[in-house]
Swiss-Prot record:
Keyword Transcription listed: no
Membrane topology note: Peripheral membrane protein
Record note on quaternary structure: Part of the photosystem II complex.
Subcellular location per the Swiss-Prot or TrEMBL entry: Cellular thylakoid membrane
Sequence similarity: Belongs to the Psb28 family.
Protein's recorded name: Photosystem II reaction center Psb28 protein
Length: 110
């Protein structure tokens, strides 16, 4: 089972919109996760130390996490994971395949 967490041990129930970009050489890339009204925000917990992508292989971590505010209230979270090598890309794709499978998601190539 693959899960995304903002606080270790607490799974985020809102499924994000994920946008991927990849360099022409295929070694580097970027994944932008956008969570609209995530549980973490609904519960009023903004003690975010990072985004943790957890599966049976272990954990992928990004610290580049930002809250979006409207009228002084947090309404969304955007997290960016930068992929710096081909092995990191392969590991990320394995995680995303597991996450998609466990949450009934699909992949659309643009």
């Amino acid at each position: 089972m693959a899960e995304i967490q903002f606080v270790r041990g607490v799974n985020e129930g809102v499924v994000p919109d994920v946008r991927l970009t990849r360099a022409k050489d295929g070694n580097t890339g970027r994944a932008v996760f956008y969570f609209d009204n995530p549980q973490l925000v609904q519960e009023g917990n903004l003690e975010i130390m990072g985004m943790y992508m957890v599966d049976e292989e272990g954990e992928i971590v990004t610290r580049e996490v930002n809250a979006k505010f409207i009228n002084g209230k947090a309404t969304a979270i955007e997290a960016i994971y930068t992929i710096r090598s081909a092995p990191e890309w392969d590991r990320f794709i394995r995680f995303m395949n597991r996450y998609a499978e466990s949450h009934g998601l699909g992949f659309n190539k643009s």
